[in-house]
Structures are given as C-alpha cells and as structure tokens.
Amino acid sequence: MNRNINSIKYISEETKMLILNEKDEFTSDKLKQFILELNIKFPHIVYAQAKLESHNFKSRIFRENHNLFGMKVARKRPTTNKGEQYNHAYFDSWKDCVVDYAFYQAAYLSDLKTEHEYLEYLKLNYAEDGKYIQKVKQLSRLPW
C-alpha cells in the first residue's frame, strides 16, 4: 500500500524541507503552484476539490485546521496531520495539508491513469455528497 510514497516528485530533500517549513500566507495562486510543484495527479481537479471542500477557502475547517480537502485523520498511511479537531484532521499549515493529499494520492491512487478513473474513485471512496463529482467537474472547468 505505501510502496508509492516515494513517487511524490520533489526537486531535492532540501527543497522538500523548505517547502514544509515555510509558513507563508495562503492564496489560491500559491495553492495552484504548490499542487504543480508536488506533481499531484489531475491538478485542476484537486484544486477544484480544495475549492469545493473549503467552501471557496472560507470554511472553519480550512481557517482553523488548515484543512483544504475535508480530510479525516489518516490511520493507514504516512500523514502530515497533527491530530483531529472538529472531526477532521488539522495541520500546521495549508502546505502540510497539500503534502498530506499528495501522500493520499501516492498511497491509494497511483495506479489511476485517467481523469475518469480518478473521478470514479472519488465517487466511490471519497465523496459524501451525491452531487460531489458533478460539482467538482463544474469547478474544474473554470480557468485556473
């Protein structure tokens, strides 16, 4: 299951530590750039998920937990979360949350090749709202 954690592409270990330790303010442009830097699969869909899950980056879970994706505490994979608050994982920074999502993808989604496969996985294993995929698709079509 964890065999693909090393598939996350970092320029170097030094860069990885700089990224994780940097405590800069959140902007949607910084999120887009960071998703690309981490080589996260299907970046426009992941960005749409973050926007949807965080209620356009305004939810309490995002503001207080730095949790962009509504992630629960990971129990069976590497994680950057620091614990649980409001029934969701909390992180030291929004960047830690994005790194955690990269770990999630590496652990569970590395074999998925197409957007269709990814959306199908989300529908069956991630979405709590019956219209989640429809909403993500709609948001992912917006320019970013």
Per-segment meaning from a language model:
Residues 1-144:
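Catalytic cores of secreted/periplasmic lytic hydrolases that degrade extracellular macromolecules
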